[in-house]
Protein backbone atom coordinates (compact mmCIF):
# COMPACT_ATOMS: atom_id res chain seq x y z
CA UNK A 1 0.00 0.00 0.00
CA UNK A 2 2.71 2.63 0.79
CA UNK A 3 4.28 1.96 -2.60
CA UNK A 4 0.95 2.27 -4.37
CA UNK A 5 0.20 5.50 -2.54
CA UNK A 6 3.62 6.87 -3.40
CA UNK A 7 3.18 5.99 -7.06
CA UNK A 8 -0.24 7.60 -7.06
CA UNK A 9 1.22 10.81 -5.64
CA UNK A 10 3.94 10.73 -8.29
CA UNK A 11 1.28 10.31 -10.98
CA UNK A 12 -0.67 13.28 -9.62
CA UNK A 13 2.55 15.32 -9.53
CA UNK A 14 3.30 14.50 -13.13
CA UNK A 15 -0.23 15.39 -14.16
CA UNK A 16 -0.06 18.69 -12.32
CA UNK A 17 3.30 19.73 -13.80
CA UNK A 18 5.77 22.29 -12.47
CA UNK A 19 2.99 24.70 -11.58
CA UNK A 20 4.47 27.64 -13.50
CA UNK A 21 3.88 29.34 -16.78
CA UNK A 22 6.54 29.86 -19.41
CA UNK A 23 7.11 33.43 -18.34
CA UNK A 24 7.38 32.51 -14.67
CA UNK A 25 9.98 29.84 -15.49
CA UNK A 26 12.09 32.30 -17.49
CA UNK A 27 11.98 34.89 -14.73
CA UNK A 28 12.90 32.26 -12.13
CA UNK A 29 15.81 31.04 -14.24
CA UNK A 30 17.21 34.53 -14.81
CA UNK A 31 17.00 35.31 -11.10
CA UNK A 32 18.63 32.10 -9.89
CA UNK A 33 21.17 31.04 -12.53
CA UNK A 34 24.89 31.47 -11.85
CA UNK A 35 25.60 32.38 -15.47
CA UNK A 36 26.49 36.05 -15.95
CA UNK A 37 24.11 38.09 -18.06
CA UNK A 38 20.58 36.65 -17.68
CA UNK A 39 19.94 38.41 -14.34
CA UNK A 40 20.67 41.81 -15.93
CA UNK A 41 18.02 41.14 -18.56
CA UNK A 42 15.17 41.28 -16.00
CA UNK A 43 16.65 43.69 -13.40
CA UNK A 44 17.70 46.65 -15.55
CA UNK A 45 15.81 49.29 -17.47
CA UNK A 46 14.41 48.76 -20.97
CA UNK A 47 17.54 49.95 -22.80
CA UNK A 48 19.91 47.96 -20.64
CA UNK A 49 17.64 44.95 -20.89
CA UNK A 50 17.93 45.08 -24.67
CA UNK A 51 21.70 45.59 -24.49
CA UNK A 52 22.26 42.72 -22.07
CA UNK A 53 19.95 40.47 -24.05
CA UNK A 54 21.97 41.09 -27.22
CA UNK A 55 25.30 40.61 -25.39
CA UNK A 56 24.13 37.38 -23.76
CA UNK A 57 22.82 36.06 -27.08
CA UNK A 58 26.07 37.02 -28.87
CA UNK A 59 28.33 35.35 -26.32
CA UNK A 60 26.11 32.26 -26.21
CA UNK A 61 26.50 31.98 -30.00
CA UNK A 62 30.28 32.40 -29.66
CA UNK A 63 30.40 29.62 -27.07
CA UNK A 64 28.38 27.29 -29.30
CA UNK A 65 30.63 28.07 -32.28
CA UNK A 66 33.79 27.41 -30.27
CA UNK A 67 32.32 24.20 -28.91
CA UNK A 68 31.57 23.04 -32.45
CA UNK A 69 35.16 23.74 -33.51
CA UNK A 70 36.62 21.82 -30.56
CA UNK A 71 34.27 18.86 -30.98
CA UNK A 72 35.05 18.68 -34.70
CA UNK A 73 38.78 18.77 -33.94
CA UNK A 74 38.39 16.00 -31.38
CA UNK A 75 36.39 13.82 -33.77
CA UNK A 76 39.06 14.19 -36.49
CA UNK A 77 41.16 11.73 -34.40
CA UNK A 78 44.49 13.43 -35.04
CA UNK A 79 47.67 11.89 -33.65
CA UNK A 80 51.00 13.21 -32.49
CA UNK A 81 54.21 11.28 -33.13
CA UNK A 82 57.02 10.81 -30.62
CA UNK A 83 60.51 9.62 -31.57
CA UNK A 84 63.07 7.95 -29.34
CA UNK A 85 66.51 6.57 -30.25
CA UNK A 86 69.25 4.63 -28.51
CA UNK A 87 71.05 1.32 -28.22
CA UNK A 88 69.89 -1.71 -26.30
CA UNK A 89 70.06 -5.47 -26.48
CA UNK A 90 67.68 -6.54 -29.20
CA UNK A 91 66.75 -9.64 -31.12
CA UNK A 92 68.86 -9.97 -34.22
CA UNK A 93 66.67 -9.76 -37.33
CA UNK A 94 65.74 -12.78 -39.39
CA UNK A 95 67.93 -12.92 -42.51
CA UNK A 96 66.63 -14.53 -45.70
CA UNK A 97 69.13 -15.30 -48.48
CA UNK A 98 68.26 -16.56 -51.97
CA UNK A 99 69.96 -17.04 -55.29
CA UNK A 100 68.99 -14.81 -58.20
CA UNK A 101 68.35 -17.90 -60.30
CA UNK A 102 65.49 -20.00 -58.91
CA UNK A 103 66.74 -23.27 -60.43
CA UNK A 104 69.89 -24.94 -61.64
CA UNK A 105 69.79 -25.02 -65.41
CA UNK A 106 71.26 -28.51 -65.51
CA UNK A 107 68.21 -29.81 -63.60
CA UNK A 108 65.45 -27.97 -65.49
CA UNK A 109 66.90 -28.02 -68.99
CA UNK A 110 64.67 -30.90 -70.05
CA UNK A 111 61.58 -28.93 -69.04
CA UNK A 112 62.66 -25.78 -70.87
CA UNK A 113 64.04 -27.41 -74.03
CA UNK A 114 61.19 -26.41 -76.37
CA UNK A 115 60.87 -22.99 -74.79
CA UNK A 116 64.60 -22.26 -75.09
CA UNK A 117 64.65 -23.27 -78.75
CA UNK A 118 61.68 -21.04 -79.41
CA UNK A 119 63.39 -18.20 -77.53
CA UNK A 120 66.55 -18.53 -79.61
CA UNK A 121 64.47 -18.42 -82.80
CA UNK A 122 62.68 -15.30 -81.57
CA UNK A 123 65.98 -13.56 -80.88
CA UNK A 124 67.25 -14.49 -84.33
CA UNK A 125 64.15 -13.00 -85.93
CA UNK A 126 64.51 -9.80 -83.92
CA UNK A 127 68.24 -9.43 -84.54
CA UNK A 128 68.25 -10.63 -88.19
CA UNK A 129 64.78 -10.05 -89.68
CA UNK A 130 65.95 -10.53 -93.28
CA UNK A 131 67.42 -14.01 -92.71
CA UNK A 132 65.57 -17.06 -93.95
CA UNK A 133 63.57 -18.90 -91.31
CA UNK A 134 62.40 -21.93 -93.28
CA UNK A 135 64.77 -24.38 -91.61
CA UNK A 136 64.28 -22.85 -88.19
CA UNK A 137 60.53 -23.10 -88.04
CA UNK A 138 60.41 -26.76 -89.04
CA UNK A 139 61.95 -28.01 -85.77
CA UNK A 140 60.14 -25.65 -83.40
CA UNK A 141 57.25 -26.65 -81.17
CA UNK A 142 54.68 -23.89 -81.63
CA UNK A 143 52.26 -25.21 -79.01
CA UNK A 144 53.45 -22.64 -76.48
CA UNK A 145 53.82 -19.95 -79.12
CA UNK A 146 50.24 -20.19 -80.33
CA UNK A 147 48.84 -19.33 -76.89
CA UNK A 148 50.78 -16.08 -76.43
CA UNK A 149 52.89 -15.04 -79.45
CA UNK A 150 55.23 -12.09 -79.82
CA UNK A 151 54.58 -9.72 -82.72
CA UNK A 152 56.35 -6.83 -84.40
CA UNK A 153 54.59 -3.49 -84.72
CA UNK A 154 55.82 -1.54 -87.76
CA UNK A 155 55.44 2.13 -86.80
CA UNK A 156 57.23 3.67 -89.75
CA UNK A 157 53.85 4.99 -90.79
CA UNK A 158 52.31 6.21 -87.52
CA UNK A 159 48.86 6.62 -89.09
CA UNK A 160 48.73 3.00 -90.30
CA UNK A 161 50.82 0.73 -88.03
CA UNK A 162 51.26 -2.81 -89.26
CA UNK A 163 51.29 -5.83 -86.93
CA UNK A 164 53.65 -8.56 -88.13
CA UNK A 165 53.98 -12.08 -86.80
CA UNK A 166 57.58 -13.04 -86.14
CA UNK A 167 57.18 -16.33 -87.97
CA UNK A 168 55.63 -15.27 -91.25
CA UNK A 169 51.89 -14.69 -90.65
CA UNK A 170 51.70 -10.95 -91.23
CA UNK A 171 48.38 -9.27 -90.77
CA UNK A 172 46.83 -5.88 -90.53
CA UNK A 173 43.32 -4.88 -89.75
CA UNK A 174 42.84 -3.29 -93.17
CA UNK A 175 45.73 -4.28 -95.43
CA UNK A 176 47.50 -7.63 -95.00
CA UNK A 177 51.15 -7.58 -95.95
CA UNK A 178 52.54 -11.11 -96.10
CA UNK A 179 56.28 -11.42 -96.02
CA UNK A 180 56.81 -7.91 -94.69
CA UNK A 181 59.80 -7.34 -92.46
CA UNK A 182 61.23 -4.41 -90.61
CA UNK A 183 64.38 -3.64 -88.72
CA UNK A 184 64.69 -3.02 -85.01
CA UNK A 185 64.69 0.75 -85.44
CA UNK A 186 61.33 0.83 -87.20
CA UNK A 187 59.57 -1.88 -85.19
CA UNK A 188 58.63 -2.57 -81.61
CA UNK A 189 58.13 -5.98 -80.07
CA UNK A 190 54.77 -6.58 -78.38
CA UNK A 191 52.96 -9.50 -76.77
CA UNK A 192 49.61 -10.52 -78.24
CA UNK A 193 47.05 -11.78 -75.73
CA UNK A 194 43.77 -13.34 -76.79
CA UNK A 195 40.77 -14.84 -75.04
CA UNK A 196 39.96 -18.54 -75.29
CA UNK A 197 37.93 -18.25 -78.49
CA UNK A 198 40.31 -15.70 -80.02
CA UNK A 199 37.62 -13.09 -80.61
CA UNK A 200 39.14 -10.53 -78.24
CA UNK A 201 42.86 -9.75 -78.50
CA UNK A 202 45.05 -7.05 -77.02
CA UNK A 203 48.67 -6.02 -77.53
CA UNK A 204 50.96 -5.34 -74.61
CA UNK A 205 53.65 -2.96 -75.83
CA UNK A 206 57.20 -2.59 -74.53
CA UNK A 207 59.79 0.10 -75.11
CA UNK A 208 62.58 -2.46 -75.53
CA UNK A 209 62.75 -5.92 -77.06
CA UNK A 210 64.73 -7.02 -73.99
CA UNK A 211 61.76 -6.32 -71.76
CA UNK A 212 59.36 -7.99 -74.16
CA UNK A 213 61.22 -11.29 -74.56
CA UNK A 214 62.03 -11.46 -70.82
CA UNK A 215 58.39 -10.98 -69.80
CA UNK A 216 57.26 -13.45 -72.44
CA UNK A 217 59.79 -16.09 -71.31
CA UNK A 218 58.84 -15.69 -67.62
CA UNK A 219 55.16 -16.05 -68.52
CA UNK A 220 55.79 -19.27 -70.45
CA UNK A 221 58.12 -20.65 -67.76
CA UNK A 222 55.41 -20.00 -65.18
CA UNK A 223 53.06 -22.16 -67.23
CA UNK A 224 55.64 -24.99 -67.24
CA UNK A 225 56.65 -24.86 -63.56
CA UNK A 226 53.04 -24.62 -62.36
CA UNK A 227 52.51 -28.20 -63.58
CA UNK A 228 55.51 -29.60 -61.63
CA UNK A 229 55.09 -31.04 -58.14
CA UNK A 230 56.38 -28.79 -55.32
CA UNK A 231 58.85 -31.37 -54.01
CA UNK A 232 60.32 -31.71 -57.50
CA UNK A 233 60.75 -27.95 -57.75
CA UNK A 234 62.67 -27.94 -54.46
CA UNK A 235 65.02 -30.61 -55.81
CA UNK A 236 65.75 -28.48 -58.88
CA UNK A 237 66.93 -25.53 -56.78
CA UNK A 238 70.20 -24.85 -54.97
CA UNK A 239 70.86 -27.07 -51.94
CA UNK A 240 71.83 -25.33 -48.67
CA UNK A 241 75.23 -27.00 -48.39
CA UNK A 242 76.07 -25.83 -51.92
CA UNK A 243 75.09 -22.21 -51.48
CA UNK A 244 76.12 -21.53 -47.82
CA UNK A 245 79.90 -21.98 -47.58
CA UNK A 246 80.65 -20.31 -44.23
CA UNK A 247 78.64 -18.84 -41.35
CA UNK A 248 79.63 -17.01 -38.16
CA UNK A 249 77.33 -15.22 -35.71
CA UNK A 250 79.32 -13.10 -33.29
CA UNK A 251 81.94 -15.49 -31.99
CA UNK A 252 79.80 -18.61 -32.46
CA UNK A 253 80.18 -20.71 -35.64
CA UNK A 254 77.06 -21.70 -37.56
CA UNK A 255 76.27 -23.65 -40.70
CA UNK A 256 73.50 -24.34 -43.19
CA UNK A 257 71.78 -26.42 -40.49
CA UNK A 258 70.99 -23.18 -38.65
CA UNK A 259 68.91 -21.99 -41.62
CA UNK A 260 65.25 -22.79 -42.27
CA UNK A 261 64.53 -23.66 -45.92
CA UNK A 262 61.55 -22.16 -47.72
CA UNK A 263 60.56 -22.32 -51.37
CA UNK A 264 59.93 -18.93 -52.94
CA UNK A 265 58.61 -19.22 -56.54
CA UNK A 266 60.59 -16.23 -57.84
CA UNK A 267 63.94 -17.31 -56.37
CA UNK A 268 63.57 -21.02 -55.74
CA UNK A 269 65.10 -22.35 -52.51
CA UNK A 270 65.64 -19.61 -49.91
CA UNK A 271 67.15 -20.01 -46.45
CA UNK A 272 66.22 -18.05 -43.33
CA UNK A 273 68.57 -17.47 -40.39
CA UNK A 274 67.10 -16.73 -36.93
CA UNK A 275 63.48 -17.04 -38.09
CA UNK A 276 62.31 -18.03 -34.61
CA UNK A 277 59.85 -20.70 -35.72
CA UNK A 278 61.39 -23.71 -34.00
CA UNK A 279 64.62 -22.32 -32.57
CA UNK A 280 65.21 -19.68 -29.91
CA UNK A 281 65.66 -16.14 -31.18
CA UNK A 282 69.27 -14.92 -31.06
CA UNK A 283 69.96 -11.51 -29.45
CA UNK A 284 72.71 -9.02 -30.15
CA UNK A 285 74.04 -6.80 -27.37
CA UNK A 286 76.86 -4.88 -29.09
CA UNK A 287 77.24 -2.83 -32.26
CA UNK A 288 79.78 -3.54 -34.99
CA UNK A 289 80.69 -6.25 -37.47
CA UNK A 290 82.33 -8.45 -34.82
CA UNK A 291 78.95 -9.05 -33.16
CA UNK A 292 76.85 -9.60 -36.26
CA UNK A 293 76.32 -12.28 -38.88
CA UNK A 294 79.02 -13.16 -41.41
CA UNK A 295 78.22 -15.29 -44.45
CA UNK A 296 80.05 -16.56 -47.51
CA UNK A 297 77.75 -17.72 -50.31
CA UNK A 298 78.31 -19.45 -53.62
CA UNK A 299 75.68 -18.44 -56.15
CA UNK A 300 77.05 -20.75 -58.87
CA UNK A 301 76.06 -18.48 -61.71
CA UNK A 302 77.64 -20.79 -64.27
CA UNK A 303 74.50 -22.94 -63.83
CA UNK A 304 71.99 -20.09 -64.15
CA UNK A 305 68.95 -20.43 -66.40
CA UNK A 306 70.06 -18.14 -69.24
CA UNK A 307 66.71 -16.58 -70.16
CA UNK A 308 65.11 -16.68 -66.70
CA UNK A 309 67.80 -15.06 -64.52
CA UNK A 310 69.53 -12.07 -66.08
CA UNK A 311 70.91 -10.78 -62.75
CA UNK A 312 73.84 -12.47 -61.00
CA UNK A 313 74.10 -12.16 -57.25
CA UNK A 314 72.46 -13.03 -53.96
CA UNK A 315 69.07 -11.70 -52.98
CA UNK A 316 68.63 -11.03 -49.26
CA UNK A 317 66.14 -9.45 -46.92
CA UNK A 318 66.03 -8.54 -43.23
CA UNK A 319 62.70 -8.97 -41.51
CA UNK A 320 61.10 -9.63 -38.13
CA UNK A 321 60.84 -13.09 -36.64
CA UNK A 322 57.83 -15.20 -37.65
CA UNK A 323 57.03 -12.99 -40.65
CA UNK A 324 56.98 -14.17 -44.24
CA UNK A 325 59.86 -12.74 -46.33
CA UNK A 326 58.47 -10.95 -49.37
CA UNK A 327 61.91 -10.80 -50.86
CA UNK A 328 60.80 -9.85 -54.38
CA UNK A 329 59.19 -6.64 -53.13
CA UNK A 330 61.46 -5.73 -50.21
CA UNK A 331 64.78 -7.54 -50.76
CA UNK A 332 68.14 -6.19 -51.96
CA UNK A 333 70.92 -7.62 -54.13
CA UNK A 334 74.47 -8.40 -53.05
CA UNK A 335 76.85 -8.44 -56.00
CA UNK A 336 79.08 -11.40 -56.71
CA UNK A 337 82.81 -10.91 -56.15
CA UNK A 338 82.27 -8.33 -53.40
CA UNK A 339 82.11 -8.05 -49.63
CA UNK A 340 78.88 -6.30 -48.69
CA UNK A 341 78.57 -4.75 -45.21
CA UNK A 342 75.09 -3.88 -43.98
CA UNK A 343 74.59 -1.70 -40.89
CA UNK A 344 71.12 -2.13 -39.41
CA UNK A 345 68.88 0.39 -37.68
CA UNK A 346 65.58 -0.96 -36.35
CA UNK A 347 62.49 1.21 -36.77
CA UNK A 348 59.61 0.15 -34.53
CA UNK A 349 56.33 1.72 -35.61
CA UNK A 350 53.53 1.73 -33.04
CA UNK A 351 50.29 3.01 -34.51
CA UNK A 352 47.39 3.92 -32.24
CA UNK A 353 44.72 1.96 -34.08
CA UNK A 354 41.07 2.72 -34.67
CA UNK A 355 39.72 5.35 -34.82
CA UNK A 356 43.07 7.18 -35.06
CA UNK A 357 44.78 4.98 -37.66
CA UNK A 358 43.24 2.41 -40.03
CA UNK A 359 45.43 -0.48 -38.88
CA UNK A 360 44.95 -4.00 -37.56
CA UNK A 361 46.57 -5.85 -34.70
CA UNK A 362 46.60 -9.35 -36.17
CA UNK A 363 44.55 -9.22 -39.37
CA UNK A 364 41.44 -10.76 -37.81
CA UNK A 365 39.35 -7.74 -38.82
CA UNK A 366 40.46 -7.85 -42.47
CA UNK A 367 37.97 -9.33 -44.92
CA UNK A 368 40.67 -11.01 -47.02
CA UNK A 369 41.70 -14.55 -46.05
CA UNK A 370 45.46 -14.65 -45.41
CA UNK A 371 46.82 -17.39 -47.68
CA UNK A 372 50.25 -17.15 -46.01
CA UNK A 373 48.87 -18.39 -42.70
CA UNK A 374 49.86 -21.90 -43.84
CA UNK A 375 53.44 -20.87 -43.00
CA UNK A 376 52.36 -19.97 -39.43
CA UNK A 377 53.51 -16.39 -39.95
CA UNK A 378 52.04 -13.15 -38.62
CA UNK A 379 49.92 -10.71 -40.59
CA UNK A 380 51.48 -8.16 -42.94
CA UNK A 381 50.04 -5.85 -45.56
CA UNK A 382 52.06 -7.59 -48.29
CA UNK A 383 50.49 -10.92 -47.34
CA UNK A 384 47.05 -9.32 -47.55
CA UNK A 385 47.72 -7.70 -50.95
CA UNK A 386 49.03 -10.95 -52.43
CA UNK A 387 46.13 -12.92 -50.98
CA UNK A 388 43.69 -10.37 -52.38
CA UNK A 389 45.24 -10.60 -55.85
CA UNK A 390 45.09 -14.40 -55.77
CA UNK A 391 41.43 -14.18 -54.72
CA UNK A 392 40.66 -11.92 -57.70
CA UNK A 393 42.66 -14.24 -59.93
CA UNK A 394 40.58 -17.25 -58.92
CA UNK A 395 37.27 -15.41 -59.26
CA UNK A 396 38.07 -13.87 -62.65
CA UNK A 397 40.33 -16.47 -64.26
CA UNK A 398 39.12 -19.66 -62.50
CA UNK A 399 42.69 -20.57 -61.49
CA UNK A 400 45.47 -19.38 -59.17
CA UNK A 401 48.80 -17.87 -60.13
CA UNK A 402 51.95 -19.88 -59.60
CA UNK A 403 53.69 -17.11 -57.61
CA UNK A 404 51.16 -17.08 -54.75
CA UNK A 405 49.84 -19.71 -52.31
CA UNK A 406 46.88 -21.67 -53.58
CA UNK A 407 43.61 -21.99 -51.63
CA UNK A 408 42.39 -25.49 -50.93
CA UNK A 409 40.54 -27.06 -53.83
CA UNK A 410 41.90 -24.72 -56.51
CA UNK A 411 44.38 -25.33 -59.35
CA UNK A 412 47.31 -23.35 -60.69
CA UNK A 413 46.94 -21.74 -64.10
CA UNK A 414 48.40 -23.48 -67.16
CA UNK A 415 47.84 -23.42 -70.90
CA UNK A 416 46.40 -26.92 -71.04
CA UNK A 417 43.54 -26.51 -68.55
CA UNK A 418 43.04 -22.73 -68.82
CA UNK A 419 43.97 -21.60 -72.35
CA UNK A 420 43.22 -17.90 -71.81
CA UNK A 421 44.77 -17.54 -68.35
CA UNK A 422 47.59 -15.28 -69.59
CA UNK A 423 45.09 -12.88 -71.17
CA UNK A 424 43.08 -12.79 -67.95
CA UNK A 425 46.13 -12.51 -65.69
CA UNK A 426 47.78 -9.60 -67.50
CA UNK A 427 44.50 -7.70 -67.74
CA UNK A 428 43.95 -8.20 -64.02
CA UNK A 429 47.53 -7.20 -63.24
CA UNK A 430 47.11 -3.90 -65.09
CA UNK A 431 43.67 -3.22 -63.62
CA UNK A 432 43.56 -0.06 -61.52
CA UNK A 433 40.23 -1.12 -60.03
CA UNK A 434 41.73 -4.35 -58.71
CA UNK A 435 44.63 -2.52 -57.06
CA UNK A 436 42.38 0.09 -55.47
CA UNK A 437 40.02 -2.60 -54.19
CA UNK A 438 42.82 -4.53 -52.52
CA UNK A 439 44.37 -1.38 -51.07
CA UNK A 440 41.04 -0.35 -49.57
CA UNK A 441 40.45 -3.79 -48.02
CA UNK A 442 43.95 -4.40 -46.63
CA UNK A 443 45.21 -2.60 -43.54
CA UNK A 444 48.66 -1.90 -42.22
CA UNK A 445 49.80 -3.63 -39.07
CA UNK A 446 49.51 -1.50 -35.92
CA UNK A 447 52.89 -2.74 -34.65
CA UNK A 448 55.42 -2.92 -37.44
CA UNK A 449 59.19 -3.34 -37.54
CA UNK A 450 61.30 -2.06 -40.41
CA UNK A 451 65.03 -2.41 -40.89
CA UNK A 452 66.91 0.56 -42.31
CA UNK A 453 70.17 -0.55 -43.90
CA UNK A 454 73.40 1.30 -44.56
CA UNK A 455 75.22 -0.63 -47.30
CA UNK A 456 78.88 -0.51 -48.32
CA UNK A 457 80.76 -2.77 -50.75
CA UNK A 458 84.33 -3.67 -51.67
CA UNK A 459 85.95 -6.17 -54.02
CA UNK A 460 86.43 -9.58 -52.44
CA UNK A 461 88.62 -11.50 -52.53
CA UNK A 462 91.48 -9.25 -53.50
CA UNK A 463 93.85 -10.29 -56.25
CA UNK A 464 96.56 -11.10 -53.70
CA UNK A 465 94.34 -13.38 -51.60
CA UNK A 466 92.05 -14.80 -54.26
CA UNK A 467 94.07 -17.97 -54.87
CA UNK A 468 94.35 -19.22 -51.29
CA UNK A 469 90.78 -18.23 -50.32
CA UNK A 470 89.27 -20.09 -53.26
CA UNK A 471 91.52 -23.10 -52.55
CA UNK A 472 90.36 -23.28 -48.92
CA UNK A 473 86.68 -22.87 -49.78
CA UNK A 474 86.91 -25.50 -52.52
CA UNK A 475 88.58 -27.94 -50.14
CA UNK A 476 85.95 -27.40 -47.43
CA UNK A 477 82.97 -27.85 -49.72
CA UNK A 478 84.12 -30.31 -52.39
CA UNK A 479 87.13 -31.95 -50.67
CA UNK A 480 89.08 -31.05 -53.79
CA UNK A 481 92.64 -29.82 -54.04
CA UNK A 482 91.69 -27.96 -57.18
CA UNK A 483 89.78 -24.70 -57.26
CA UNK A 484 86.12 -25.47 -57.93
CA UNK A 485 84.85 -22.00 -57.13
CA UNK A 486 85.05 -18.78 -59.07
CA UNK A 487 85.34 -15.20 -57.94
CA UNK A 488 82.30 -14.44 -60.09
CA UNK A 489 80.23 -16.81 -57.99
CA UNK A 490 81.05 -16.02 -54.35
CA UNK A 491 79.54 -13.34 -52.13
CA UNK A 492 80.58 -12.25 -48.62
CA UNK A 493 78.04 -10.61 -46.30
CA UNK A 494 78.47 -8.76 -42.98
CA UNK A 495 75.23 -7.85 -41.19
CA UNK A 496 75.42 -5.99 -37.87
CA UNK A 497 73.77 -3.40 -35.65
CA UNK A 498 74.88 0.22 -35.87
CA UNK A 499 75.87 2.34 -32.88
CA UNK A 500 72.24 3.42 -32.46
CA UNK A 501 70.33 0.29 -33.21
CA UNK A 502 66.72 1.25 -32.58
CA UNK A 503 64.34 4.08 -33.26
CA UNK A 504 60.81 3.96 -31.87
CA UNK A 505 58.11 5.95 -33.62
CA UNK A 506 54.96 5.95 -31.51
CA UNK A 507 51.59 7.53 -32.14
CA UNK A 508 49.50 9.06 -29.36
CA UNK A 509 46.18 10.95 -29.47
CA UNK A 510 46.73 14.63 -30.18
CA UNK A 511 43.36 15.50 -28.57
CA UNK A 512 41.96 13.34 -25.78
CA UNK A 513 38.79 13.68 -23.73
CA UNK A 514 40.57 15.71 -21.04
CA UNK A 515 41.68 18.22 -23.69
CA UNK A 516 38.11 18.43 -25.01
CA UNK A 517 36.48 19.00 -21.61
CA UNK A 518 39.04 21.58 -20.52
CA UNK A 519 38.56 23.58 -23.72
CA UNK A 520 34.78 23.38 -23.58
CA UNK A 521 34.78 24.54 -19.96
CA UNK A 522 37.35 27.25 -20.66
CA UNK A 523 35.30 28.78 -23.45
CA UNK A 524 32.07 28.65 -21.42
CA UNK A 525 33.73 30.21 -18.41
CA UNK A 526 35.53 32.89 -20.45
CA UNK A 527 32.54 34.15 -22.44
CA UNK A 528 29.66 33.59 -19.96
CA UNK A 529 31.25 32.87 -16.58
CA UNK A 530 29.50 29.51 -16.36
CA UNK A 531 30.30 26.04 -15.13
CA UNK A 532 28.89 22.53 -15.35
CA UNK A 533 26.24 23.40 -12.75
CA UNK A 534 25.04 26.23 -14.98
CA UNK A 535 24.52 23.74 -17.75
CA UNK A 536 22.52 21.54 -15.37
CA UNK A 537 20.35 24.54 -14.46
CA UNK A 538 19.73 25.25 -18.12
CA UNK A 539 18.88 21.60 -18.70
CA UNK A 540 16.41 21.72 -15.83
CA UNK A 541 14.46 24.63 -17.29
CA UNK A 542 14.41 22.96 -20.70
CA UNK A 543 12.87 19.86 -19.08
CA UNK A 544 10.25 22.03 -17.34
CA UNK A 545 9.37 23.72 -20.63
CA UNK A 546 8.89 20.35 -22.29
CA UNK A 547 6.88 19.12 -19.30
CA UNK A 548 4.46 22.05 -19.42
CA UNK A 549 4.06 21.73 -23.17
CA UNK A 550 3.18 18.04 -22.92
CA UNK A 551 0.58 18.68 -20.19
CA UNK A 552 -1.05 21.42 -22.27
CA UNK A 553 -1.16 19.17 -25.31
CA UNK A 554 -2.70 16.29 -23.33
CA UNK A 555 -5.34 18.57 -21.80
CA UNK A 556 -6.17 20.00 -25.21
CA UNK A 557 -6.60 16.52 -26.69
CA UNK A 558 -8.89 15.45 -23.82
CA UNK A 559 -11.06 18.54 -24.28
CA UNK A 560 -11.48 17.87 -27.97
CA UNK A 561 -12.39 14.24 -27.27
CA UNK A 562 -15.20 15.26 -24.81
CA UNK A 563 -16.73 17.87 -27.06
CA UNK A 564 -17.01 15.62 -30.09
CA UNK A 565 -19.82 13.21 -28.82
CA UNK A 566 -22.07 16.07 -27.46
CA UNK A 567 -25.00 16.85 -29.80
CA UNK A 568 -26.04 20.50 -30.22
CA UNK A 569 -29.20 21.76 -28.40
CA UNK A 570 -32.44 21.39 -30.38
CA UNK A 571 -34.07 24.21 -28.51
CA UNK A 572 -33.25 27.16 -26.26
CA UNK A 573 -31.29 26.46 -23.06
CA UNK A 574 -33.33 25.93 -19.82
CA UNK A 575 -34.09 28.89 -17.58
CA UNK A 576 -33.10 29.22 -13.90
CA UNK A 577 -36.66 28.47 -12.81
CA UNK A 578 -36.68 25.27 -14.83
CA UNK A 579 -33.38 24.19 -13.31
CA UNK A 580 -34.75 24.88 -9.77
CA UNK A 581 -37.92 22.94 -10.55
CA UNK A 582 -35.84 20.01 -11.66
CA UNK A 583 -34.33 19.86 -8.18
CA UNK A 584 -37.68 20.36 -6.35
CA UNK A 585 -39.82 17.86 -8.30
CA UNK A 586 -38.60 14.91 -6.24
CA UNK A 587 -41.45 12.65 -7.26
CA UNK A 588 -40.93 13.28 -10.91
CA UNK A 589 -44.63 14.34 -11.12
CA UNK A 590 -46.07 15.58 -14.38
CA UNK A 591 -46.75 19.23 -14.96
CA UNK A 592 -49.90 20.64 -13.25
CA UNK A 593 -51.14 21.82 -16.56
CA UNK A 594 -50.93 18.30 -17.93
CA UNK A 595 -54.34 16.70 -18.44
CA UNK A 596 -55.80 13.49 -19.48
CA UNK A 597 -56.80 13.13 -23.06
CA UNK A 598 -60.39 14.23 -22.20
CA UNK A 599 -59.30 17.20 -19.99
CA UNK A 600 -59.48 15.34 -16.68
CA UNK A 601 -57.02 15.99 -13.88
CA UNK A 602 -54.97 13.13 -12.45
CA UNK A 603 -56.28 12.07 -9.08
CA UNK A 604 -52.91 11.85 -7.39
CA UNK A 605 -51.67 15.17 -8.71
CA UNK A 606 -50.21 17.36 -5.91
CA UNK A 607 -48.77 20.84 -5.82
CA UNK A 608 -45.51 20.74 -3.84
CA UNK A 609 -44.12 23.80 -2.06
CA UNK A 610 -41.18 25.60 -3.65
CA UNK A 611 -38.24 25.63 -1.23
CA UNK A 612 -36.90 28.95 -0.11
CA UNK A 613 -33.22 28.02 -0.28
CA UNK A 614 -31.09 27.04 -3.31
CA UNK A 615 -30.15 23.39 -3.74
CA UNK A 616 -27.00 22.10 -2.07
CA UNK A 617 -23.63 22.13 -3.97
CA UNK A 618 -23.27 18.43 -4.77
CA UNK A 619 -20.31 16.92 -6.60
CA UNK A 620 -22.62 16.17 -9.49
CA UNK A 621 -22.86 19.91 -10.19
CA UNK A 622 -19.12 20.34 -10.71
CA UNK A 623 -18.15 21.47 -14.16
CA UNK A 624 -14.63 19.98 -13.97
CA UNK A 625 -14.23 16.15 -14.28
CA UNK A 626 -13.18 14.18 -11.25
CA UNK A 627 -10.07 12.74 -12.87
CA UNK A 628 -8.49 16.18 -12.97
CA UNK A 629 -9.28 17.01 -9.31
CA UNK A 630 -7.29 16.03 -6.29
CA UNK A 631 -8.03 16.34 -2.60
CA UNK A 632 -6.54 19.03 -0.42
CA UNK A 633 -4.86 16.40 1.67
CA UNK A 634 -3.05 14.99 -1.36
CA UNK A 635 -1.90 18.45 -2.41
CA UNK A 636 -0.63 19.17 1.07
CA UNK A 637 1.14 15.80 1.18
CA UNK A 638 2.92 16.52 -2.09
From Swiss-Prot:
Question: Region Disordered: which residues?
Answer: 594-620
Per the annotation, the residue ranges of the short sequence motif PY motif are 614-618
Q: Which reaction does it catalyse?
A: Na(+)(in) = Na(+)(out)
Protein name in the entry: Epithelial sodium channel subunit beta
For this chain, the family text in UniProt reads: Belongs to the amiloride-sensitive sodium channel (TC 1.A.6) family. SCNN1B subfamily.
Q: Tell me the first and last residues of the signal peptide.
A: none
The membrane spanning regions, by residue number, are: 51-71, 531-551
GO annotation terms (biological process)? aldosterone metabolic process; artery smooth muscle contraction; cellular response to acidic pH; cellular response to aldosterone; cellular response to vasopressin; epithelial fluid transport; erythrocyte homeostasis; gene expression
Q: What gene does the UniProt entry assign to this protein?
A: Scnn1b
Compartments reported by the entry: Apical cell membrane; Cytoplasmic vesicle membrane
